[in-house]
């Protein structure tokens, strides 16, 4: 029996595999509000479908929240969020964004 890792590595190496590697992912628009619930939802999805690759899919706003952007999920099933607070109001605002540390809470 081939493991997920062996299947992916064989594919990368151009070798024959027992079947093509399969990976699907989705957003979890309610569970993505906190790292723990997102991890739990992602693991449950993987345990249910047993894909060859797991992709963690946070809310699309995770990379801007530490600058003060705020958003809200309003029920869109694909996970789209509505921005409720933007930090860029004028072109010059780009010049005043602070450099974020890699350890910032949402990064």
Predicted segments, located by residue:
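Catalytic cores of TIM-barrel enzymes
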Residues: 1-107
């Amino acid at each position: 029996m081939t493991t997920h890792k062996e299947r992916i590595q064989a594919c990368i190496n151009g070798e024959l595999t027992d079947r093509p590697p399969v990976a699907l992912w989705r957003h979890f628009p309610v569970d993505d509000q906190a790292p723990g619930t997102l991890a739990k939802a992602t693991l449950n999805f993987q345990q249910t479908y047993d894909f060859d690759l797991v992709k963690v899919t946070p809310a699309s706003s995770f990379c801007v929240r530490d600058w003060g952007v705020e958003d809200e999920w309003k029920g869109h099933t694909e996970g789209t969020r509505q921005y409720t607070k933007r930090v860029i109001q004028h072109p010059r605002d780009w010049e005043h964004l602070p450099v974020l540390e890699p350890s910032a809470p949402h990064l």
